[in-house]
């Protein structure tokens, strides 16, 4: 079967003024160690929305880093992959070398190769190149037949959540508050349930998403409720929660997190803040209460493999998060929907 798109391909890029454009471009040449993948599904991430609608949007900015698809062509020197293979492709891939300070210390997402590697021209294209570096450093995972491409497009965001969880200590029957219950916020709730947390509080301003969170046996609270801190403390024996995950870019949410985390608890900064953002914190309070602050950026290929296993084994049912699908030609409409969040969780683009 011929899966190729021919000599031309479509890609989506930032046009400026809060718009995207779909461009027909010449298909780039395939290197002897590269592969072409026909995108079947790609999720829209909050960082993609920020690129389009935020103050950092600029023409030609690449979009899409959650793609999965079918291999359409392979370079002459490629081993272990074949045309027709169904794959997840990771955009950034570290070196994993013992000689790399970052990788050898478990900070793979800080590796310079992680930043320099990528899919070409981007994941949000009907076809894209996976370069040799990604291919030979575990950046491509073959998919079991029972996993759909839409599920595979959820591997990367779930992997990001898993990486965050690997950065702090917790115990069964602990309590957690998740601030911001978009797709990754719900994934954090799913992981908390999987890991045996006794109390899961979900906070947001979006009533649709709060109602959605109730499906996962959580206690939901509007984050603008003036009694949030009192409610959480009353439910936790006046102690506060063991863990707070801030799964939003809101700095107000980050500040609020310190008001209802317990002594010796952990605040996880997961949502992506805007560049240059600053907040005021009472460092004396943080010090005296021994509050741990953890940051988590992106995911390594250890995390993507873990995410694939959790999805494949049905430990995490990511299908529950997919509410809308759009065709590549409808990308502008898809991004506007993702920005509004109206009755939506995860939005997937298909080609």
Residue ranges and their predicted role:
Residues 205-206, 273, 299:
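Residues in the short beta-alpha loop(s) of Rossmann-like NAD(P)-binding domains
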Residues 168, 211, 216-290:
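Glycine-rich cofactor phosphate-binding loops and adjacent beta1-alpha1 units
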Residues 145-226, 230:
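Mid-domain Rossmann-like dinucleotide-binding core that forms the NAD(H)/NADP(H) cofactor-binding site
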Residues 97-179:
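NAD(P)H dinucleotide-binding glycine-rich loop of Rossmann-like/cofactor-binding domains
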Residues 86, 175, 265-266, 292:
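Short glycine-centered segments of the SAM/dcSAM-binding site in methyltransferase folds
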Residues 28-42, 55-101, 141-144:
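Glycine-rich beta-strand-centered segment in the early N-terminal region that forms part
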